[in-house]
A protein has these predicted regions:
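Tryptophan-paired
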Residues: 42-94
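Sec-dependent bacterial lipoprotein signal peptides
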Residues: 1-15
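Generic, low-specificity signal for short hydrophobic/alpha-helical stretches with a mild N-terminal bias
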Residues: 11-15, 53, 66, 133
Length: 169
């Protein structure tokens, strides 16, 4: 009896697909931040698209509010570049290009999940029109849904009103 129960238990566990993570692609998640304050920001006047990517590579269209974006990499290449085009009066032609150099690493997750590619970012370069800097917080890109890249933008700041001392009479 006990052997039959154990065999049935193992068989049921082997057929279970709940162990597979929902996200089976390694996509680097990037967040947008203000270089002045360090706080997360939301932009709606930006288009983000792939440079030299086949077909329609627009990830974010102008008018779409975005504070985080997944920037897919290509397993057959060692570099991927993204264009940040600003759709705002006075900023025409001030596109920024962010380029990631990386190594593709095949990874076998499990029988249920199968295989995927992980990526190790080896270098990141950018132009500096409205992007102030790019920080790669974790160079290993896996299928874990975590913010790994922080893109800091130059943002306009409203001047703070200086405190005025109370007048004493």
């Amino acid at each position: 009896k006990y052997i039959l129960a154990a065999v049935l238990g193992f068989a049921a566990a082997a057929c279970n697909t709940d162990g597979c993570l929902d996200n089976q692609s390694s996509l680097p998640k990037a967040g947008l931040f203000s270089s002045a304050t360090g706080n997360a920001i939301t932009l709606s006047n930006i288009e983000i698209s792939g440079v030299g990517a086949p077909g329609d590579s627009v990830l974010v269209a102008p008018g779409t509010a975005v504070s985080e974006v997944y920037l897919p990499m290509r397993s057959t290449k060692q570099s991927t570049a993204w264009r940040f085009r600003y759709d705002q009066e006075g900023l025409e032609g001030l596109d920024d290009i962010v380029t990631f150099d990386y190594e593709s690493q095949p990874f076998f997750a499990s029988e249920e999940c199968g295989a995927m590619y992980n990526y190790r970012i080896t270098r990141c370069t950018t132009t500096y029109n409205l992007i102030d800097s790019v920080v790669v917080a974790d160079s290993l890109i896996t299928n874990t849904d975590r913010l790994r890249i922080k893109i800091y933008f130059r943002t306009a700041q409203t001047p703070e009103t200086p405190d005025t001392p109370d007048e004493q009479g």
